[in-house]
Amino acid sequence: MKNLTGIFSALLVAFNEDGSINEQGLRQIIRHNIDKMKVDGLYVGGSTGENFMLSTAEKKEIFRIAKDEAKDQIALIAQVGSVNLQEAVELGKYATELGYDCLSAVTPFYYKFSFAEIKHYYDTIIAETGNNMIVYSIPFLTGVNIGVEQFGELYKNPKILGVKFTAGDFYLLERLKKAYPNHLIWAGFDEMMLPAVALGVDGAIGSTFNVNAPRARQIFELTKQGKLAEALAVQHVTNDLIEGILANGLYLTIKELLKLQGVEAGYCREPMTAKATDKQLEVAKALYAKFL
């Protein structure tokens, strides 16, 4: 297994206008991340990949393309989580057979599952696949909050390496790192990377890293070195960019920024708005000129 610390892009997926996967575009996004953004790895099949609007077959196809293009150049994490446990197991087995370095799974959502049910979900995926696991905690979208003691229960399974922490509760983040120093934490909010690194996270997984990974690495390394004023200056610039991206439409804007760099980033998947408006295109061009 490759080193799983550092800067990981949450991989965007290029779609054609009819909603099908644009394989050529997806390969270009992967190459851009490896060759230009110099990321340490890719987090494939997450929210940024518009994953929860895709069929099982489409999710497998994205895993296949990503592994085929990246090969062994960087670390690959496959997000296989689903409210359908059988699908999660099927995807986990497939990604493991492809040679993914680790699995990740979002906490099961929509229904108010008990913690015992959530623990069973992770233990089942691990038992069926034999692969290592990263818990994907994103409570503002799932409504699932896992506490310090509950993480301790999850961590009794030695295959669970840590958590992708996409939450603003930095008290919980600090408590987790103190309680379980041997378990890894990946920051999931790009705009709060500096304080997360100051609290000891081991890496970061972000959507904006598809276009802004060099700055993310600067923040990560400068903060680790204790150069907080310098890191904060880079975080300010990063957050100015993120503010513009969020106001203009997150995934559409990142895809337009990639297109301005010659990457065939394609469309978004409906029911998201598939195509940027003229106004959104103008904003993307302005962001590109100012920040990239």
From Swiss-Prot:
The gene is nanA. GO terms for molecular function: N-acetylneuraminate lyase activity. The lineage of its organism: Bacteria, Pseudomonadati, Pseudomonadota, Gammaproteobacteria, Pasteurellales. PANTHER family: N-ACETYLNEURAMINATE LYASE. The active site is at Y136, K164. Signal peptide: none annotated. CDD domains: NAL. Keywords: Carbohydrate metabolism, Cytoplasm, Lyase, Schiff base. It comes from the Bacteria. It is found in: Cytoplasm. It comes from Actinobacillus pleuropneumoniae serotype 5b (strain L20). Pfam families: DHDPS. Gene3D superfamilies: Aldolase class I. Homotetramer. GO terms for cellular component: cytosol. The keyword Manganese does not apply. Belongs to the DapA family. NanA subfamily. This is N-acetylneuraminate lyase.
